Design a protein with these regions (language model features):
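Non-catalytic peripheral regions of nucleotide-handling enzymes
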Residues: 1-81
Length: 81
């Protein structure tokens, strides 16, 4: 199918956060700014709910990244880095 794009599979990533839970560094690269953040809360009615806090980050190396904190298992993942 043309025009469709496959979503990037999330991969585990090391994130250092501040006291409020906002990312300060992704792997070894510092975060310059948080462009946007949002929460996805889905499948709450099932045995495997999905609850994630997403962050679109601007890194000090000039790249953008989208990461999320899985609020169910406590781990961090990169959706786009």
């Amino acid at each position: 199918m043309s025009g469709l794009r496959q979503l990037a599979t999330p991969r585990p990533v090391a994130v250092r956060t501040g006291a409020s839970g906002v990312p300060l560094a992704l792997e070894r690269t510092r975060v310059e700014a948080v462009a946007e953040d949002w929460v996805v809360d889905d499948r709450w009615w099932t045995d495997s709910p999905l609850r994630r806090r997403y962050f679109e980050l601007v890194l000090t190396n000039g790249r953008n990244a989208v990461v999320f904190h899985d609020l169910v298992d406590g781990r961090w993942y990169a959706q786009r880095a």
